[in-house]
A protein has these predicted regions:
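Flexible glycine-/small-residue-enriched beta->alpha junction loops
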Residues: 1-45
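Conserved beta-ketoacyl condensing-enzyme motif
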Residues: 1-3, 75, 80-91, 188-210
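Condensing-enzyme catalytic core mediating Claisen C-C bond formation in acyl metabolism
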Residues: 14-28, 102-174, 178, 182-183, ...
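N-terminal extracellular/periplasmic Venus flytrap/periplasmic-binding protein-like
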Residues: 19, 56-143, 215-216, 220-233
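Short, well-ordered beta-strand elements within core beta-sheets of diverse protein domains
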Residues: 43-53, 133, 177-185
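Cysteine-centered functional microenvironments
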Residues: 46-53, 58-60, 114-126, 189-199, ...
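Active-site-proximal alpha-helical scaffold in enzymes
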Residues: 47-76, 132-140, 207, 246-267, ...
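Active-site pocket-lining segment
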Residues: 162-242
């Protein structure tokens, strides 16, 4: 209305009508639109369904922080950080070097306060942030900086789940085996796994599903042996539990982190990047070092 007002008086009249609440920023609700439940409530239900304990979640969360703190000390992230404007940023301050299983165990459940297992400590914190990646063909990549880490996008897969039957954040557990089966690969053929850690429970439930033959056969419709899942190859430089979850930018953050790690590995090394999303969606990509 102000832009269409004619004359200074008309503009001033419009500005005087602005109330304080009109300037208040809307805080996005982390809720599933189709159910009204928060993602944490959905993760609680899935953790109960798969029998993932509070202790398992806290152990995983502490490991995510340890990995991120080590990677920060080794300056792994330095090439991935861009300072905003006049404020220099050369390290991520979110990973905690004092995080322990004992400290995490003292935190109270956040979504089911009586019987829940998901706490602020084993959930990813929502953060302010942005991330970007370049996608180029063989010719276009020569226009990028020579020291930029580059990987090859080999294939990708998307999946969706029945939220009530399988759990809101479980679609990657369908997409991953389908992608691997199509490429005639097993779990051991993947040298690096970058899995979005929305919640420690969600990662652990996904891994359990990937190790469950009935899930693979009946839900993913994959009737082949993929082998034991290599948990030690998951998020070696920390994940969203330690680094945070900038809504809308996490996928690019994980892709850039995967590319930076793959760039240090031999040519032909493979990485699976996995991200769960609202609506029961899952997005998975297969990358390869060049």
């Amino acid at each position: 209305q102000t832009s269409s007002a004619k004359g200074a008086r008309a503009v001033l009249r419009q500005l005087l009508q602005v109330r304080r609440k009109d300037l208040r920023l809307a805080i996005p609700a982390v809720k599933e639109r189709t159910t009204g439940w928060s993602m944490g409530q959905h993760a609680e239900a899935t953790a109960s369904q798969w029998g993932v304990t509070r202790e398992e979640q806290d152990v995983y969360a502490a490991e995510s922080h340890r990995n991120a703190v080590r990677a920060r000390a080794e300056e792994f992230y330095r090439s991935l950080l861009i300072s905003p404007g006049l404020y220099p940023v050369d390290a991520d301050t979110l990973p905690r070097d004092d995080s322990t299983i004992e400290k995490l165990a003292r935190l109270k459940p956040a979504f089911d306060r009586e019987q829940g297992s998901i706490t602020p400590g084993n959930s990813s914190p929502l953060t302010d942030g942005a991330a970007s990646v370049w996608v180029a063909d063989a010719e276009g990549r020569h226009r990028l900086a020579r020291d930029a880490p580059m990987v090859r996008l080999v294939d990708w897969e998307q999946a969706a789940v029945d939220i009530d039957a399988e759990g809101l954040l479980m679609a990657p557990a369908l997409a991953i085996p389908r992608l691997l089966a199509r490429r005639d690969l097993g779990y051991a053929d993947i040298d690096l796994w970058e899995i979005h850690e929305a919640f420690a429970a969600q990662v652990l439930c996904t891994i359990r599903a990937l190790e469950d033959r009935s899930w693979l056969r009946e839900r993913a419709r994959i009737d082949r042996e993929l082998g034991p899942f290599p948990r030690e190859r998951v998020n070696p430089n920390g994940g969203s539990l330690a680094l945070g979850h900038p809504f809308g930018a996490t996928g690019a953050r994980i892709l850039s982190q995967a590319a930076a790690q793959l760039a240090t590995m031999p040519a032909g090394s493979r990485c699976v990047v996995s991200v769960c999303a609202a609506g029961g969606l899952g997005h998975v990509a297969l990358l390869e070092a060049v």
